[in-house]
Amino acid sequence: MSAAAGPSMSAADGLLALAEEAERRRDFSTAASCLDSALSPPHAASLLPLAEARARLRLAALLLARSKGLATAKAHLERALLLLNPLPSAPPRLKLLAHSLLANVYGLLGAVPSQKHVLRRGLALLASASASGLLPAEPSLLWTSNFQAQLASAFAAEGDAASALSALSEGAAAATELESPQLDLFFAANTLHAHLLCWEDSNSVADAAARVADLWDALTDQEKEHWVGLFFYTELLQTFYLLRVCDYKAASKHVERLDTAVKSEMQRGQRIKELGTELSAVERSLAQPMLKERERAALVHKQRQLKDQLRALCGYDELNDVLDYGDKLLLAPPPMHGEWLPRTAVFVLVDLMVVMVSRPKGIFRECGKRIQSGLQIIHEELSKLGIVDGVTEENLEHSAIWTAGLYLTLLLQFLENSVAVELTRSEFVEALEALAQMKNWLTRFPTILQGSESTIEMLRGQYAHSVGYFDEAAFHFLEALKLTENKSMQSMCQVYAAVSYICKGDAESSSEALELIGPAYRTMDSFVGVREKTCIIFVYGLLLMRQQNPQEARTRLASGLKIAHQQLGNIQLVSQYLTILGTLALQLHDTGQAKEILKSSFTLAKTLYDIPTQIWILSVFTELYRELEERGNELENSGYASKKEIDLQKRLTEARSHPFHQELVEKVRIEIQPMHDLMQKHHEMPGSVANADLDIPESVGLSTPQPSSVRRLIDTSSVRRSTRRRVS
């Protein structure tokens, strides 16, 4: 530029102009370099305060958009506010933007008190600007919505659910006054999110879920098509809610919609990326000097066409929103924007939901495909963060903690489901290797994944039980119980430990099982949903059978089977219920019913490739044929059972000789040493994801207290396999 040869002021202006031009071309690294140069000596001294503040805001926004240089962005924003505050001529929108961006940075850095302080200052500034007429009503309401949503996130990060809900209520009121369906749905979804996190009143949660559904249904088809981020957010929240209340049939319908939407969205995202690349090439050509008029006119026409195509494809008015579409699933209009989770994480989460609704039905082939696909994508995302072999959490940059925690938690969710599938299929080596991976990730990232320690202990118990180490299994289940404050998970640990004690077979172990299951039985109606109840009834029925009380056991188990069949849809649990009921029918000499029940049970066990349960059923069939004096059937059945037993023993021997077997079953808890500094940072991260007691993915609009995990809502144990048991 000719201005570059002029005085320092002109050089600074030239750099700012170059930055603006680079931003238009979406060459953000060049734009950031130009802005940085303009704000550095000797150019910075010549900038007027307002121009300097604008430049610092632009640079900070670029750094935040690319998730780089949080500390640098914070310094620029703090300096920008110092410049803007005493300037009466500074536009209110600029000051409000500075407050909002700085609050966002404080949130990302875990400085929640500073975040809340800046947000309250922003709200005070907003009230003053609105009262003086400097800010029209509509922008004022939008900024109110923005600050209240951020404030709710800050409160949630501190575990103050009541204050978070209050802030969301204030934001929702502003959205209603704006008559914005998008913001109405945004705040309704965040309110549901908050209720799911604290879950103090089931009716309030149900009402929040119903309001979200009603608002979504009221949208036009065009709005539903264009507000893709809100679609994924609300559908996943509804899915988490339905899984929590054990309405798997309704949850499956939401998962089907999500899965279809992911496929469509991936295609659309690819098309947008292609058009965006083409647009960038056209704009680079337009920036070349000495273009002929005809060439320039053709390029301008092409540029207009591409922009129109992009807008039509996405439904956004702002071109930057369109071009960012391939990276973000936006939830709300400016100045809020924001995403819930990274786009890729949302797609991976949908894969996980498919696994979770498919696994109890025994659809293992689809589960396997989704698990492998999810793991591959997660490893790719972790590689982008520098998390490769040998890297531990002490090597992580602070800005990467939240994203790393999210993907690491999703990784463990997929591995947990892999362990569950392989144990059900009696593929013990595969289960062992997946569990060993979980243990390895925990030891490498003990702070971020600390909340998964209880789940891993529980899975060690599941593995130990499956390969016949019942004493070790009970130890790990009870260790898992100590590591969680989640009442539901504690109950399931008691159930699993009780089953392991029963399988030991001696009188003392049966007494220990009764001590565990008795308190759980008395409180089983207090849980949300019916998962805990069906499992507790199952174990209680086993104990009654062991105590030679077959009629009472039969009555209890029949009630549990009805719930398991109608509400849970977990065919392994149904198979095992049927097996015990068939056994009881035989004990009561009801051979006709016993035969019919056992046939149904065996069909389900074969569907699941569940060899231990098949052997269990075959052993009962042998007794049945012996009582009926059907010698031929007895011998044939016994021979078939022997083949199955040989197959099982081969699998067990292979697992027990594996190098990782002993360290997984031994009665020693995994030793982890969380890093104190990282733990403090991670606990303060508004979207951190590592506590097994908190089963939900975090949102930008609303985050959780303490390090939390996707499992806070997903709660994979809600459809966990019932532990296999071999009771004679």
Predicted features and spans:
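N-terminal alpha-helical scaffolding segments that mark the starts
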Residues: M1-A71, P86, R93, V105, ...
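C-terminal non-catalytic interaction modules
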Residues: S2-S33, S37, R79, R121, ...
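Structural signature of alpha-solenoid helical repeat junctions
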Residues: S8-S10, T30, L47-A51, G69-T72, ...
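Residue register of alpha-helical TPR repeats
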Residues: D13-G14, S33, E52-R56, A75, ...
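Residue-level detector of the short coil/turn that links helix A to helix B
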Residues: R26, S67-K68, G110, G159, ...
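Alpha-solenoid helical-repeat scaffolds
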Residues: T30, Y325-E485
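Amphipathic alpha-helical segments of tetratricopeptide repeats
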Residues: D36-A44, E78-P88, R120-L135, S169-E177, ...
